[in-house]
């Protein structure tokens, strides 16, 4: 709609608001610059029917819409009769300003700082359009003066009352606190006049009634001149900002630029790359330690903001830059002991005057958190490693940055150690615990040689500094370092940090083959009872520790302990998910995108993975050594309850036995299944050959010792399987014969047989004089007897199920089984159902339902005989 279009009589307020929405910012500025002539003409003219004219005006096309003034002479007479009220742009802005002031006042009544912060920004934008030189509208001055007083009252109450604000109110209050003091400095003279006499200030309207002679154009001229001067100045450097404004960087303007950058943080359409370049320039010209610290803190935060915006990992360039800046920040803090960075420090609001040490003060406190930046740097490296293909050289190059990160973590620990020496600072223990926990997270899963290299490089980086928690002389060995870090967290932390420290130490001990100590710590911690109440990352660490303890037991030759420990993880079939080494494909459960995203974020980097193929191989091998003798034992003794050690292994074995043709083994699972089949048949040498041919054993330390241990285990379990299978066919069996068959020493054979006899697994006696095993007859059933009893049990179960089915169909009717003549006397003298209820012929006794009188017939009698 053209700005020359005239508003109607009856809808002055509606048309004015509609016009305001349709006007662009450029049109409004041009309208003010060109003067009020067109507004006066539009307000002076009038139509007899506003609705019809508005419609007609809206339909005019081309040059016709500019012919409104052609018949103005005919309407001069009607102007005297009908008065039209059309609001100017200035009046409309004043109305908007008044509504915003009212909204702020309402927010102050209910203490809603979130809405106050929003309306305060809106108020400043509106007041900027209404400024005449350095003078602002009086209602604006009143609003910001009252708001500053109210803010000071609220801050005073917060220091006295222990009740805290909610997060939204706290953020709003902090935002207003940061902006209002800087904003009110520009209007300090007017604010002082208002506070001196509020009534007189608001009643005096002479200043507002004086028209401003085209302030916009004057501002433009002055801006152009300033820009020209800046362009001519070649001594310093300048950056052109938005709208062609020239930004001057001087040591005095550092805090002003930082303030503007921090205020725009988190807003849309913010060029973070440009902000980082500005802060890098500010860092170059910073002179005082306070300026350098403030710039570095803001710069590191801005780099991390880039990582969160895209949802991906921080780029390598930005990560390395953040690492260097954080290292430089720690260096500056070390060189200037009177400057400290604390989370509890208050924000310094005066951008023109930096803080100085007052009498009785030892430190200049700067708000910030070194440990939070350190944790974020660690998390960004982890996210980067998650996104890189682990089988490329890029992953190795990226992993090399862990050394620099470990140095940062170590220096952060030393920094908080130094702060905690001064009790007056009241540094929370949690900050130091977080730094130590991060350090422990980077060493617990590594071999001792790698940890030693990391520690040596870290101590070289810090020079002559000393640590009270981890002294140099006590942390030379990796085991000592892990023990010192864990003991400190045991004594000075609670909850998650304490549990994670316990799990890290158990993992480290199991990784370095200290099985019995790691097992005892795991049992004494009782974490298995409370682990479900911890967070997901701690549960993942618990699963990893459990698996590592199981692998350690296997390396020690403790097959039963290893299988029992690995059962929970490997028996579930969800090893990838439980160990955070991959996302399982859900067939039936629909996983939301948010859950899948969180699951992927929790994945561990590849260098922390436990080899799942090796884990499966260990689990299946242990299950084979336990299940095959058990199957042989239960096969010859049906009275023994058939228990299952590993359902996963049993299913694999049954599937393998159902195959008609079995080819050569191709993978780990095939090797174990064919070894199981050979072991069950007594061919222990063949089983050993299959197990030794698995190539995954080479990934374990001391692979030859592992293979030797497995060969001995297979020999012993082969002996047990042979005795369980063929005991019913022997009266006596020489130990020397068994020794030759299984290539074991006679003493070992005697020990195995004695153990089986003592556990009542074998009905026999050991004649140590003649070195023979004497089997007792009548205790173990023969194969035929076992099959006969099995058939008897199945027949009895079939009869019982049939009679239960019949009872259900007849609905428990009495006399359901009392039928005469085989078919209930159908067609007899008593008609249909004759003889029902009478005695049976042939001398047969009545049989009760339920099959309780079944005796097994001839087969059962033969078995009983």
From Swiss-Prot:
Gene3D superfamilies cross-referenced by the UniProt entry: Winged helix-like DNA-binding domain superfamily/Winged helix DNA-binding domain
Entries under Pfam families matching the protein: eIF-3c_N, PCI
Biased composition annotated in UniProt, kind: Acidic residues: 16-54, 69-80, 226-235
Main location: cytoplasm
GO cellular component: eukaryotic 43S preinitiation complex; eukaryotic 48S preinitiation complex; eukaryotic translation initiation factor 3 complex, eIF3e; eukaryotic translation initiation factor 3 complex, eIF3m
Annotated stretches, region: Disordered: 1-92, 206-243, 801-865
Record keywords: Cytoplasm, Initiation factor, Protein biosynthesis
Known role: Component of the eukaryotic translation initiation factor 3 (eIF-3) complex, which is involved in protein synthesis of a specialized repertoire of mRNAs and, together with other initiation factors, stimulates binding of mRNA and methionyl-tRNAi to the 40S ribosome. The eIF-3 complex specifically targets and initiates translation of a subset of mRNAs involved in cell proliferation.
Family: Belongs to the eIF-3 subunit C family.
Name listed for the protein in its UniProt record: Eukaryotic translation initiation factor 3 subunit C
Taxonomic lineage from the root: Eukaryota, Fungi, Dikarya, Ascomycota, Pezizomycotina
This protein's encoding gene: NIP1
């Amino acid at each position: 709609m053209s700005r020359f279009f005239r508003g109607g009589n009856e809808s002055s307020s509606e048309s004015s608001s509609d016009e305001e929405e349709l006007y662009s910012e450029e049109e409004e500025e041009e309208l003010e610059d060109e003067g009020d002539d067109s507004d006066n003409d539009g307000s002076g003219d009038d139509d007899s029917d506003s609705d019809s004219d508005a419609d007609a005006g809206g339909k005019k096309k081309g040059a016709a819409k500019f012919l409104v003034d052609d018949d103005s002479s005919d309407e001069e007479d009607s102007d005297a009769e009908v008065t039209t009220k059309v609001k100017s742009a200035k009046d409309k802005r004043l109305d908007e300003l008044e509504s915003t002031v009212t909204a702020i006042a309402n927010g102050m009544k209910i203490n809603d700082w979130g809405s106050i912060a929003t309306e305060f920004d809106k108020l400043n934008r509106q007041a900027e359009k209404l400024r005449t030189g350095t003078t602002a509208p009086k209602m604006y001055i009143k609003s910001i003066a009252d708001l500053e007083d109210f803010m000071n009252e609220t801050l005073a109450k917060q220091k006295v009352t222990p009740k805290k604000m909610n997060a939204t109110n706290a953020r709003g209050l902090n935002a207003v606190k940061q902006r209002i003091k800087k904003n009110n400095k520009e209007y300090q003279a007017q604010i002082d006049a208002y506070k001196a006499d509020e009534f007189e200030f608001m009643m005096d309207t002479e200043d507002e009634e004086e028209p401003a002679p085209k302030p916009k154009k004057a501002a433009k001229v002055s801006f152009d001149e300033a820009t020209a001067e800046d362009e001519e100045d070649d001594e310093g450097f300048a950056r052109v900002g938005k709208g062609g404004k020239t930004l001057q960087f001087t040591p005095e303007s550092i805090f002003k630029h930082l303030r503007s950058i921090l205020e725009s943080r988190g807003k849309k359409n913010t060029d973070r790359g440009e902000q980082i370049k500005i802060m890098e320039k500010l860092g170059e010209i910073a002179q005082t330690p306070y300026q350098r610290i403030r710039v570095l803190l803001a710069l590191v935060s801005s780099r991390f903001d880039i990582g969160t915006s895209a949802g991906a990992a921080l780029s390598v360039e930005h990560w390395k830059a953040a690492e260097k800046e954080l290292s430089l920040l720690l260096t500056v803090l070390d060189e200037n002991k009177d400057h400290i960075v604390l989370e509890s420090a208050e924000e310094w609001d005066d951008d023109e005057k930096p803080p100085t040490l007052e009498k009785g003060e030892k430190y200049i406190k700067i708000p910030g958190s070194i440990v939070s930046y350190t944790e974020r740097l660690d998390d960004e490296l982890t996210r980067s490693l998650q996104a890189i293909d682990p089988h490329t050289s890029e992953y190795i190059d990226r992993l090399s940055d862990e050394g620099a990160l470990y140095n940062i973590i170590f220096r952060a620990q030393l920094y908080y150690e130094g702060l905690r020496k001064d009790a007056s600072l009241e540094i929370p223990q949690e900050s130091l615990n977080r730094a130590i926990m991060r350090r422990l997270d980077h060493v617990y899963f590594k071999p001792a040689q790698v940890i030693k290299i990391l520690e040596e490089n870290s101590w070289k980086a810090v020079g002559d500094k000393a640590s009270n928690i981890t002294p140099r002389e006590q942390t030379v060995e990796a085991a000592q370092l892990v023990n010192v870090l864990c003991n400190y967290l045991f004594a000075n932390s609670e909850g998650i940090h304490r549990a994670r420290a316990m799990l890290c130490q158990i993992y480290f001990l199991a990784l370095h083959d200290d099985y019995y100590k790691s097992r005892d710590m795991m049992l004494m911690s009782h974490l298995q009872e409370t682990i479900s109440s911890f967070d997901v990352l701690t549960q993942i660490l618990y699963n990893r520790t459990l698996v590592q303890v199981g692998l350690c037991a296997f390396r020690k030759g403790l097959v039963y302990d290893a299988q029992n420990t690995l059962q929970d993880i490997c028996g579930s079939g969800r090893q990838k998910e439980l160990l955070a080494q991959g996302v399982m494909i859900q067939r039936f459960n629909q996983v939301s995108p948010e859950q899948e995203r969180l699951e992927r974020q929790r994945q561990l980097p590849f260098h922390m993975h436990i080899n799942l193929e090796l884990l499966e191989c260990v689990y299946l091998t242990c299950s084979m050594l336990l299940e095959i003798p058990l199957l042989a034992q239960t096969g010859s003794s049906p009275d023994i309850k058939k228990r299952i050690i590993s359902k996963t292994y049993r299913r694999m074995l049954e599937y393998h036995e159902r195959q008609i043709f079995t080819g050569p083994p191709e993978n780990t699972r095939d090797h174990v299944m064919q070894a199981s089949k050979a072991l069950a048949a007594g061919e222990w040498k063949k089983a050993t050959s299959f197990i030794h041919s698995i190539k995954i054993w080479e990934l374990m330390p001391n692979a030859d010792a592992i293979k030797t241990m497995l060969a001995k285990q297979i020999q012993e379990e082969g002996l047990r399987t042979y005795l369980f299978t063929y005991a019913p066919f022997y009266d006596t069996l020489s130990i020397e014969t068994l020794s030759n068959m299984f290539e074991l020493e006679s003493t070992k054979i005697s020990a195995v047989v004695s153990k089986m006899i003592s556990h009542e697994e074998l009905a026999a006696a050991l004649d140590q004089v003649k070195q023979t095993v004497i089997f007792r007859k009548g205790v173990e059933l023969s194969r035929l007897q076992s099959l006969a009893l099995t058939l008897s049990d199945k027949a009895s179960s079939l009869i019982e199920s049939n009679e239960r089915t019949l009872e259900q169909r007849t609905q428990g009717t009495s006399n359901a089984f009392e039928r005469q003549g085989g078919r209930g006397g159908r067609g007899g003298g008593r008609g249909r159902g004759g003889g029902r209820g009478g005695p049976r012929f042939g001398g047969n006794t009545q049989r009760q339902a339920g099959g309780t009188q079944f005796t097994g017939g001839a087969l059962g009698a033969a078995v009983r005989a």
